[in-house]
UniProtKB/Swiss-Prot annotation:
Active site: 99, 194
Span of the signal peptide: none
Summary of the function given for this chain in its UniProt record: Catalyzes the 2-thiolation of uridine at the wobble position (U34) of tRNA, leading to the formation of s(2)U34.
GO MF annotation list: ATP binding; tRNA binding; tRNA-uridine 2-sulfurtransferase activity
Region (Interaction with tRNA): 144-146
Binding site for ATP: 6-13, 32, 122
Organism taxonomic ancestry: Bacteria, Pseudomonadati, Myxococcota, Myxococcia, Myxococcales
Reaction(s) the record says it catalyses: S-sulfanyl-L-cysteinyl-[protein] + uridine(34) in tRNA + AH2 + ATP = 2-thiouridine(34) in tRNA + L-cysteinyl-[protein] + A + AMP + diphosphate + H(+)
InterPro entries from the UniProt entry: MnmA-like (IPR004506), MnmA-like_C (IPR046885), MnmA-like_central (IPR046884), MnmA-like_central_sf (IPR023382), Rossmann-like_a/b/a_fold (IPR014729)
NCBIfam families per UniProt: PRK00143.1, trmU
Descriptive protein name: tRNA-specific 2-thiouridylase MnmA
GO cellular component terms attached to this protein's record: cytoplasm
Any Gene Ontology biological process: tRNA wobble position uridine thiolation
Source organism of the structure: Anaeromyxobacter dehalogenans (strain 2CP-C)
Length: 351
């Protein structure tokens, strides 16, 4: 089988390539160049120059062809610009979801198909055929599971993608990399947003859109002015740290009013929600569930999930979510992903 492997230069995707090559497949390595990095940014994140060279070295070690695909324009339009727009408009984006949906499993998958190949990545997730359809499942290692970022994959895509490390725990992946003689076997995992190479997300947004960043007031839910801020792009709903406010009780961001350049803060209870709407919903099966269904809902990657009822809106492009109990930090713009046991049912952007 011919398989195109998306190689980021990390241990997971390099091991995915090694496992597939070891099974005798015709493996082709490719790294996506998503941004123009300066020398100062080297080594900070995946897909930076040093990582491209790590991917190239892994491919050389495995004896497979290797290419670099320039996707800067598409990535800028579909991921970076949306990231900036969301932050300045008071939402909390999830660029990894956008990258997977709009670039990796769209543009790159199309290139793989043009070569008569499947597409493999180093994601920790699994795909299985059950009941006559393809199902997206959580990884065998719960601590590394990345299915949250993949909810946008439908039946068509799942038929042509492979997740070779999804059934392995991280130590086993590193052991396989060492066995294959890969220099990245002990390379640390990337923790940063891949295109934010200097500073944090707030600094990145301020540099990309300085004219759209406005200082403003930090106010209580009762309207009392408590302080000032440098821009709503530096905050997210549910945030506690970094508010710069004194007081006997902790305060959390309750909502962001970008139009008024106002950050509203309150108690943990006020920053929690048990009902919300989801927009831009997609369903792995290709069709929304009928009526109200009981599912586990994750409102961010590291969230264990909360039991709730999900009711798809007419047409399936949206959904109403009612949680069994309030959850703090249900941030507009973030992904809400729905699970039935170990199966990803679908997801969308929190309204």
């Amino acid at each position: 089988m011919r398989i195109l492997v998306a190689m980021s230069g990390g241990v997971d995707s390099s091991t995915a390539a090694a496992l597939l090559a070891g099974e005798g497949h015709e493996v082709i390595g490719v790294t996506m160049r998503v941004a123009d990095y300066s020398d100062a940014a080297r080594g900070r994140s995946c897909c930076a120059p040093d990582d491209v060279e790590d991917a190239r070295a892994a491919a050389r070690r495995l004896g497979i062809p290797f290419y670099v695909a320039n996707v800067e324009a598409r990535f800028r339009e579909r991921v970076i610009d949306r990231f900036v727009d969301d932050y300045v408009e008071g939402r909390t984006p999830n660029p990894c979801v956008a990258c997977n949906t709009e670039v990796k499993f769209d543009w790159l998958l199309a290139r793989a198909r043009a070569l008569g190949a499947k597409l493999a990545t180093g994601h920790y997730a699994r795909v299985e055929e059950r009941g006559g359809r393809r199902r997206l499942l959580t990884a065998a290692d719960p601590a590394k599971d990345q299915s949250y970022f993949l909810y946008g994959l439908g039946q068509d895509a799942l038929g042509d993608v492979l997740f070779p490390v999804g059934a392995l725990a991280k130590p086993a992946v590193r052991a396989e990399a060492a066995r294959a003689g890969l220099a990245v076997a002990e390379k640390p995992d990337s923790q940063e947003i891949c295109f934010v190479t200097l500073g944090d997300a707030g600094d990145f947004v301020a540099l990309r859109a300085p004219a759209r960043v406005r200082p403003g007031e930090i106010v209580s839910t009762a309207g009392e002015v408590l302080g000032r801020h440098d821009g709503v792009h530096r905050f997210t709903v549910g945030q506690r740290r970094g508010l710069g406010l004194a007081g006997p009780a902790p305060r959390y961001v309750v909502r962001l009013d970008a139009a008024a350049a106002r950050v509203v803060v309150g108690s943990a209870e006020e920053a929690s929600r048990d009902r919300f709407e989801v927009r831009e919903a997609t369903w792995v099966s290709g069709a929304p569930p009928g009526g109200a269904v009981e599912l586990r809902v994750k409102v961010r990657h590291r969230h264990e999930g909360e039991r709730g009822t999900v009711r798809a809106r007419a047409g399936g492009a949206g959904a109403e979510v009612r949680l069994a109990r309030p959850v703090r930090g249900v941030a507009p713009g973030q992904a809400a992903v729905f699970y039935d046991g170990d199966e990803v049912v679908g997801g969308g952007r929190i309204a």
